[in-house]
Curated annotation (Swiss-Prot):
Presence of the UniProt keyword Transmembrane in the record: yes
Membrane topology, as annotated: Multi-pass membrane protein
TM annotation in the entry: 103-125, 558-580, 593-610
PANTHER family: MEMBRANE METALLOPROTEASE ARASP2, CHLOROPLASTIC-RELATED (PTHR42837:SF2), REGULATOR OF SIGMA-E PROTEASE RSEP (PTHR42837)
Enzyme Commission (EC) number: 3.4.24.-
GO biological processes: proteolysis
Protein name as it appears in the record: Putative zinc metalloprotease CT_072
Major location category of this protein: membrane
Amino acid sequence: MTIIYFVLAALALGFLILIHELGHLLAAKAVGMSVESFSIGFGPALVRKKMGSVEYRIGAIPFGGYVRIKGMDRNDKDNSGDKEKTVYDIPEGFFSKSPWKRIFVLAAGPLANLLVAIFVFGILYFSGGRTKSFSEYTSIVGWVHPSLEQQGLHAGDQIFFCNGQPYSGHKMAFSSSLLERKLSLQGQHPAYFSESEAFSLEAPFNPNMEGVPCLGASYLLYRGSDPLPEKSPLVDAGLSEGDRLVWMDGLLVFSGAQVSQMLNEKQSFLRVERQGKVVFVRQARVLAGDLTLTPYFKNELIDCQYEAGLKGKWASLYTLPYIINGDGFVESKVKLLNDERVSLDYNLELGDKIVAVDGIPVMSNADILRLVQDHRVSLIFQRMSPEQLTVLEQKAADQAFINSYDMDDLLRVAESVGEEREVSRLGDYRLVTRVQPRPWAHIYSEALLDKQRALASKFRDEQERRYYLERIEAEKQRISLGIPLKDLAVQYNPDPWVLMEESVSDSLKTVKALGMGRVSPQWLSGPVGIVRILHTGWSVGIPEALAWIGLISVNLAVLNLLPIPVLDGGYILLCLWEILSRRRLNMRLVEKALVPFMILLVLFFVFLTLQDLSRVFVG
């Protein structure tokens, strides 16, 4: 099937080029220009056939195509052989027609691509659209960059507007911040546990320096078709296909990235009695050797270590950054030795009594010290009904997500964590406590990383190779639950004009980012890369392939309309100058100006092709 998809991808790209050049051809004939040749591809002709006055060709270099119209070359002459005549005097020639007619011919190619795009998007719309992951287009946030979290954006929030435009998903947040180096967001904190509340924030953000600003929310459904690894911490949890992870250590969870971040933050989940009420707190664990302990409290810690039955040096023990008495009451904070360089959130208050650590009841500070050496998580899973797992229209999916919780039952289960008699099951919710997460390498086979190592070792640049190999080794040590999760599918089917607007907008944003130096040309794809993208689209399904065909057709139109010499937009600019100046072009100067741009264009396509081939063979 791979070969079939490759052939379909190549045919799709060839079709888009054909349509573009056909637009030029038909427009030229419509205004009375004489067309000499029509070619798909450049270079030596692999196939050629003359029909009437036009020679039709397929070139050996598949970088595009061209329509050669009589009189476009300065060296063209009319049949009289009069050397004093210019290209403007050649009958049925390109320059013999008015500038407006020439603009019509030049714009006809991109216009043909836009018409194809709207036609393809129309087929996609009336066939029901595409099945996509909920996270891809949701307005609900699944994970937030720490710098934005400090500004008030949290996982579970719903964004309505991003930099003044209706929000269409996490990709929009990335592209907007890439162009404007800031994010201005308006939205709401949905009514999960309390009343919904509007929010607005504006913060500087540079993706080139900070990475991704946020990710979309996901349903975090257990993929029962993939058996749990034998060493998974949840292997005996009794999970079923479609069970949804909704809560972990006091927080609703909205994405795999959020879950991973929480697992690797080295925090303990505490049940605390505060002023007659029970509250839940996540507090960072720190090494005792990193704290400013007085000799008295150091001896107290050593005594506590002995009582807890912990071996090793006291400085290597994890502890909470507080002085905690024998009954579990917080007496004072303890600062870090290097608190000027490292910030630490203190979430406990003086007088708090710790009654449970990671869901396990405690009676003394020795119990607390013993339990904070490791981290066990408390999880709540939701049994999803068949109706809740039904594929929804994307427009209705966000509200369905917000309404998918039964907060009364969920709160009752969550609030029982750390009690002597926990509510292990209520309604659709089930509590799984004292789960011991493990490093990735402990759960999974090393063989799964061998392919990534092999790809990384192929990088020629030593620093780049070392960087990726180090990342792979670091990933091995990341703490994991060892559970395969999937997202809920939604039906994404905006009307054709919305897809057109988004495609044109994305293309123009890319051009703008390139011009401002905020996007590297290495992000772009040439003909080989486009074929690979289309190949992937066909392998996913016909709707996905149609979406990519429409998007690439729009990109071809936008690219060719750029005001760059040798492109359609460059020639249109010359025609407009001719109209405004009311003077004919000096073809000698025009050709001299075109040569360097032609060389740069060829070099650019060669660069893109080599880059595409590098992705194919190196990865």
